[in-house]
């Protein structure tokens, strides 16, 4: 089915919340199945014991929970985490996305904390803004 695996905007254009090209439509059943079966293959065949999802926020919560559940059926110690944000807007509603704001809805799926990273080392996009480890005052509470 043309366009099935990629998320599109209401006008039919492809969405690019990754800023790297088309984003996958993880909320569609066959795309979800493809993602789950792919990680299961890697876990079984290559004994991968952890999976990191770059820009996890482009994926929906249900898919990320399905990934973690399937992996934990193989081995409960397999670690799943990702970046809980996107690099652009997406037609998938925020309430359905695997964002940091929705981490409580992710069953055993962790989200990387850019807040702690930036508090410790300084803002990732502002090299002149030091973090706690470089002596910037007032950050002690943000890195606890």
Regions found by a protein language model. Give the residues of each.
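Substrate-binding/active-site clefts of carbohydrate-active enzymes
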Residues: 1-46, 60, 64-75, 79, ...
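Short catalytic-loop micro-motif centered on adjacent basic/acidic residues
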Residues: 50-56
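Acidic-and-aromatic substrate-binding clefts and catalytic sites of carbohydrate-active enzymes
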Residues: 56-62, 87
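Conserved alpha/beta catalytic core and glycan-binding cleft of carbohydrate-active enzymes
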Residues: 68-144
């Amino acid at each position: 089915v043309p366009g099935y695996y990629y998320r599109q905007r209401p006008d039919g254009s492809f969405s690019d919340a990754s800023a790297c090209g088309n984003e996958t439509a993880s909320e569609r059943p066959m795309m979800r199945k493809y993602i789950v079966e792919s990680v299961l293959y890697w876990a079984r065949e290559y004994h991968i014991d952890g999976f990191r999802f770059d820009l996890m926020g482009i994926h929906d919560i249900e898919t990320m929970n399905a990934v973690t559940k399937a992996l934990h059926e193989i081995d409960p110690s397999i670690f799943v985490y990702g970046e809980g944000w996107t690099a652009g807007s997406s037609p998938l509603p925020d309430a359905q996305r695997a964002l940091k704001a929705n981490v409580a809805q992710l069953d055993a799926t962790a989200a990387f904390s850019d807040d702690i990273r930036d508090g410790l080392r300084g803002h990732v996009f502002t090299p002149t803004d030091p973090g706690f480890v470089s002596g910037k005052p007032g950050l002690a509470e943000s890195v606890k």
